[in-house]
């Protein structure tokens, strides 16, 4: 997450400094805990697989943000143990506020709400209505920063990006194998027998990441991340052309 607050200038720097000055210690605690726990207990498949396979988790969470609800629940189950209670020093009202923030941030990592949140971010920026002293606006910024960090692999330096792309694709292929075994339709790009990593990455960067990070760059200094993102897009576009 520190990458989203990288050095730079302009409007982003002003927003970043203001946000930092408005973060209370419990806000920082909530962000750190949400970042650490946002994927706890991940099963290696996505929400669509859980819903289509009628998994126990999908049934338990009524097909709604299945994994994200699961991550939240697992986190707070652990925190109920007095030996693991990170919030022991907080009062009742503070504990509730921190819990609400963490739940909001982790649920915001669901790709099912990605485009809605990007639209909200763009609309708020265009209206000039961000009020970082407002708890709702501040929590929303933290929510989108956590989500940005969660899907930031293409914003990393090329060697790191390639390494983690291979790991992500192997997870996709494992899900594709499970879909075949369950006689379910194989998700696009999840079939290891017909791999096309460059096309997968070009689509993800172009339609998901670039609009999101471009909007985010209006309120946070993420110049180095944007540079990496554009570089990695270019190398994947070249690879996609070579493969076609």
Predicted segments with their positions:
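Divalent metal-dependent phosphate-bond-processing catalytic cores, especially two-metal-ion Mg2+/Mn2+ enzymes
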Residues: 3-25, 33-244
């Amino acid at each position: 997450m520190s990458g989203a607050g990288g050095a730079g200038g302009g409007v982003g720097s002003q927003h970043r400094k203001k946000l930092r000055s408005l973060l209370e210690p419990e806000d920082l605690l909530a962000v750190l805990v949400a970042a650490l726990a946002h994927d706890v207990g991940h099963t290696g498949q996505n929400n669509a697989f859980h819903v289509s396979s009628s998994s126990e988790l999908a049934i338990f969470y009524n097909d709604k943000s299945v994994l994200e609800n699961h991550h939240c629940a697992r986190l707070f189950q652990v925190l109920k143990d007095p030996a693991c209670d990170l919030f022991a020093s907080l009062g009742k009202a503070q504990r509730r506020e921190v819990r609400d923030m963490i739940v909001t941030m982790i649920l915001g990592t669901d790709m099912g709400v990605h485009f809605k949140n990007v639209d909200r971010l763009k609309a708020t920026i265009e209206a000039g209505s961000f009020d970082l002293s407002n708890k709702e606006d501040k929590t929303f910024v933290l929510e989108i920063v956590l989500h940005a960090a969660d899907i930031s692999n293409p914003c990393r330096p090329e060697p790191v990006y390639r390494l983690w792309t291979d790991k992500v694709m192997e997870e996709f292929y494992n899900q594709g194998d499970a879909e075949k075994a369950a006689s379910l339709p194989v998700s696009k790009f999840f079939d290891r027998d017909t791999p096309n990593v460059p096309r997968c990455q070009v689509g993800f960067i172009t339609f998901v990441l670039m609009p999101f990070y471009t909007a985010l760059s209006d309120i946070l200094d993420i110049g180095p991340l944007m540079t990496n993102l554009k570089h990695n897009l270019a190398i994947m576009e070249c690879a996609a052309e070579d493969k076609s």
